[in-house]
Amino acid sequence: QKPKAVINAIKDYYENDHSNVHRGVHTLSVRATEAYENAREKVSQFVNSPNKNQIIFTKGTTESINLIAGSLTNLIEKNDEILITAMEHHSNIVPWQELCKRTGAILKIIPINDNGEILIDKYTEMVTNKTKLVSVVHLSNTLGTINPIEEIIDSAKLNNAITVIDGAQSAGHLLVDVQELDCDFYLF
């Protein structure tokens, strides 16, 4: 279900301002574009992004992950390593499997313990100069685990790996500060 405020905003848009964004100079297009850019500004503030132009709208987290994985084909090479956790949702597994298939990279799984927590010591051992990307869920809706993404990002950055954080379940429940996290991508 959707909050009433969301339903009302969508209804108002379709009744009063439905037009292509950034595609016209007529009144409806201008209003739709202003609303779109205002939303970008609000999201930027919500996650403390240093620049609203770093906010990219997609249909959802799955599409965002697919977009990133599809964009990295020329940066990932044979025997490079991509790390994900054993708790990932299918949408944060399959795109990386497909990227590995296209490039010859190796997908490695970060183990978790019986409580559903990342074995952080094993993770830090797994991150090497071959690691090109680390993609992990911030908060697992199946296990209830809140991952130590600050530590995960820091270890990845020490090896110049790209960091992708799946925030689909966390952004609505936890304070997210992308400047403090210093991740490359935070998706929700």
Where are these regions (language model features)?
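Pyridoxal 5′-phosphate
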Residues: 1-188
